């Protein structure tokens, strides 16, 4: 693969988002438990291999691939109930 093809490919990835694999389900959050907090591993892009904690709406299970728009933010950790 030439340098130009590599640039084009990374541009396409960044345009649509970064694929990330769900490696752990941490728990449910939100007022009614509609959000699932998961730990994901970034599969491509400049942060490849980095592990993040993110909040996901909808059904999700270990091994699913999510497309993240950005890889900078990380969800706050779940805290115990008061």
Swiss-Prot record:
Top-level taxon of origin: Archaea
GO CC term (a single one): cytosolic small ribosomal subunit
PROSITE patterns to which the protein is assigned, alphabetical: RIBOSOMAL_S28E
Record Pfam families: Ribosomal_S28e
Entries under SUPFAM superfamilies matching the protein: Nucleic acid-binding proteins
GO biological process, one term: translation
GO molecular function: structural constituent of ribosome
Family to which the UniProt record says this protein belongs: Belongs to the eukaryotic ribosomal protein eS28 family.
HAMAP family per UniProt: Ribosomal_eS28 (MF_00292)
Family matches, as NCBIfam families: PRK04007.1 (NF003080)
Name recorded for this polypeptide: Small ribosomal subunit protein eS28
Organism annotation: Aeropyrum pernix (strain ATCC 700893 / DSM 11879 / JCM 9820 / NBRC 100138 / K1)
Gene behind this protein: rps28e
